[in-house]
Swiss-Prot record:
Protein name: Enolase
Residues the record lists as binding Mg(2+): D247, E291, D318
Chief location bin: cytoplasm
Localization annotation: Cytoplasm; Secreted; Cell surface
Keywords: Cytoplasm, Glycolysis, Lyase, Magnesium, Metal-binding, Secreted
Protein family per UniProt: Belongs to the enolase family.
Record-linked CDD domains: enolase
Pathway it works in: Carbohydrate degradation; glycolysis; pyruvate from D-glyceraldehyde 3-phosphate: step 4/5
Required cofactor names: Mg(2+)
Organism: Acinetobacter baylyi (strain ATCC 33305 / BD413 / ADP1)
Cofactor note: Binds a second Mg(2+) ion via substrate during catalysis.
Amino acid sequence: MFMSQIVDIRAREILDSRGNPTIEADVILASGVVGRACAPSGASTGSREALELRDGDKARYLGKGVKTAVNNVNTIIRDALVGKSVFEQKDIDNTMIELDGTENKEKLGANATLAVSLAAARAAADEKKIPLFQYIADLRGQTILTMPVPMMNIINGGSHADNNVDIQEFMIEPVGFTSFSEALRAGAEIFHSLKSVLNKKGLNTAVGDEGGFAPNLRSNEEAITVILEAIGQTGYKAGSDIMLALDCASSEFYKNGQYILAGEGNKAFTSNQFSDYLAGLVNQYPIISIEDGLDESDWEGWSYLTSILGDKIQLVGDDLFVTNPKILQRGINEKVGNSILIKYNQIGTLTETLDAIYLAKDNGYSTVISHRSGETEDSTIADLAVGTAAGQIKTGSLCRSDRVAKYNQLLRIEELTKAAYRGKAEFKGLN
């Protein structure tokens, strides 16, 4: 028996940051090394995401238990993977894909396959005595490592908050800095400044699922203006040090072919009108990135949005592409969007996640590695962002340990690698 051989795999039900069950998996090697990873969980999900398997037993965790998925790991997946070398990531992942045999992993559950896939990578890195980011880099021959620009979600609306704001996330991107640690400091200072701005206006400073504030505001635009006020208070310059980013999550307010902004008196827009509305915001404010500006099924609308904004800012497909190489390829062919959000639980294995990242890179699309609104202390996405030189990471606000765990891991990686922080150079139209 060789030391890198998988001798056991164990999964358990743990809790995520919302108090809902999720899966944690351990991959155990002959050498005694144990790799551990947890699957995250989303709130606003794309309809073509790989399936997160839940038990549906209302008497237990309100139907959200994951015992079935845990059992799939402890029996079917374990039986198929024990005896394999942990260094064969592609073989491990492909075995699970074949075992499942469905397009969206509905048999085993993407939460089951992902936890095992990531735990195997962690075990492999530990067995080689190298950091996880280095192991991920070596999987695809990535020789240059970079620190990602953080996309920090500081005001929440939509399905991430119980307020009257339609756009789901208002974010800051600290682009005008020479290191990740300085960029992080700027983000934290602006976050605290925003709290005082909201306090002075008598607005709520409770935080949402991802640690951003969720005040009731008069309009979506007011969220932008309070953030600009907070940036100004800290002495940083919006438009040079700090850029803004939006995640519309517009599938959440797309009804019968129209985009309906409930927070603005149920104002209804056609696809092109909503694109023009977004273009108006871009002209008026220092916005460098818009995610899911239109519904995931509105390919024609996306085409128009890309034609008017695609050479000016980053247009990120999340619900649109769901980290799926096949769907991304369609986007590339039809010139839709210019960036992809990478959420590995949308696809269910590390190998397929890397396929999506490198397909995007090879076709000039930027990549943003992302958390989910239901997270754990697992910080794998930090290593993934550096190990693929993705360029950007989206992992929430500057509070809640489920978010900060990723930022802290990035600080450790920066200290270890001295990897470059490219800031503005990551964006079209900013260099």
